[in-house]
Amino acid sequence: MEAIAKHRFASISPQKARLVADQIRGKSVDQALEILTFSNKKAAVIIKKVVESAIANAEHNEGADIDDLNVAKIFVDEGPIMKRIMPRAKGRADRILKRSSHITIVVADR
């Protein structure tokens, strides 16, 4: 059985979130939470909440045992990009891209 949790429009770039996602792919949920707890990346805090949500979904909706769960799939897709302007010298302007992510986690039995 599988349980899914998503965090859409997370305010972190997909490139940075994928660094953390690659570390927990295929691990047991206990091991994944441990890795995320001791990581000092912003993405780790966001992804940890999604993993905890997926665990709660598996327990509540599917009646799964937490000890048997592992991170079957985790992927980070690109969300919408907000474009902002940063004023520069001599009347010029640069574009700043505020990137967002859609984080999806699937937990399943081993």
Swiss-Prot record:
It comes from the Bacteria. GO terms for biological process: translation. GO terms for cellular component: cytosolic large ribosomal subunit. Keywords: Ribonucleoprotein, Ribosomal protein, RNA-binding, rRNA-binding. One of its GO terms (molecular function) is structural constituent of ribosome. Pfam families: Ribosomal_L22. HAMAP family: Ribosomal_uL22_B. Part of the 50S ribosomal subunit. Belongs to the universal ribosomal protein uL22 family. NCBIfam families: rplV_bact. This protein binds specifically to 23S rRNA; its binding is stimulated by other ribosomal proteins, e.g. L4, L17, and L20. It is important during the early stages of 50S assembly. It makes multiple contacts with different domains of the 23S rRNA in the assembled 50S subunit and ribosome. This is Large ribosomal subunit protein uL22. It comes from Aliivibrio salmonicida (strain LFI1238). The lineage of its organism: Bacteria, Pseudomonadati, Pseudomonadota, Gammaproteobacteria, Vibrionales.
